[in-house]
Amino acid sequence: MDGFDRSNAPVEYQRVEWISDIFVFGMGVCWLINYAGMIYTSLQEQTYSMAPLALCCNFAWEMVYGLIYPSKSRIEQGVFLAGLVVNLGVMYTAIRFAPNEWAHAPLVMNNITLIFALGVLGSLTGHLALAAEIGPALGYSWGAVACQLLLSVGGFCQLLGRSSSRGASYTLWLSRFIGSGCVVGFAILRYMYWSEAFNWLNSPLVLWSLGVFIAVDSLYGICLWNVKKYEHGQERSNARKAQ
């Protein structure tokens, strides 16, 4: 049974499908807020918010499952296409301002556009290869898992590497965390009420990935709070010295 084709869903799942659709809609709203927030932050602070490799992988995933292997759910398909459109702005601002973060590495700074292009191309072909290997329905989910791990770990490493809240905010963190949490919500419903197609969600690798996502994104919030606390302390100290 193909998890993409809801017309074959069992009666048990059809009864709770509206709840799943609420989670899908919530995922879309949160990620659109996140994308819009990243564009705004990039323009204000002249930097990028999402780690480049994660951004390329995520953008390519939306291309593959928004255009090439579209979902049969109109809500899900609408969410993916809306995300892809807004993500174009995220890509543009990232490419425009990324050189500001790489002045210490001229080879990277002078080839940002090429690096992003290769990142998207590599991710796009990778997602297509995965879909060809295990099928679009499973490729959609495992590709999303890869994107989420890159987003979580990449964002956390970027925060630690910058030792600054530049390009970060509580809004960006919470919208990403809650948006991905909504994915967990509808995945649980599909596993519980459509086990024939989604029994694989109980696999050790999926559960490990879920644990990494929750742990790393929770640590991100804690570290962001500490970084902002330090920055506020520095601002107060500098203000006192200026008096």
Curated annotation (Swiss-Prot):
Protein name per its UniProtKB record: Terpene cyclase nodB
Organism: Hypoxylon pulicicidum
Glycan-modified residues: 111
Keywords annotated in UniProt: Glycoprotein, Lyase, Membrane, Transmembrane, Transmembrane helix
Subcellular localization(s) per the UniProt record: Membrane
Matching InterPro entries: PaxB-like (IPR039020)
Pfam families: Pyr4-TMTC (PF25129)
Free-text function comment from the UniProt entry: Terpene cyclase; part of the gene cluster that mediates the biosynthesis of the indole diterpenes nodulisporic acids (NA). Nodulisporic acid A (NAA) and its chemically modified derivatives are of particular significance because of their highly potent insecticidal activity against blood-feeding arthropods and lack of observable adverse effects on mammals, in particular the tremogenicity associated with the paspaline-derived IDTs is not observed.
Pathway linked to the protein: Secondary metabolite biosynthesis
Parts forming coiled coils: none
Enzyme Commission code(s) on record: 4.2.3.-
Molecular function GO labels: lyase activity
Keyword Lyase (UniProt): yes
First-level EC class: lyase
Gene Ontology CC, one term: membrane
TM segment ranges: 19-39, 50-70, 75-95, 112-132, 134-154, 169-189, 205-225
Major localization class: membrane
Family of this protein: Belongs to the paxB family.
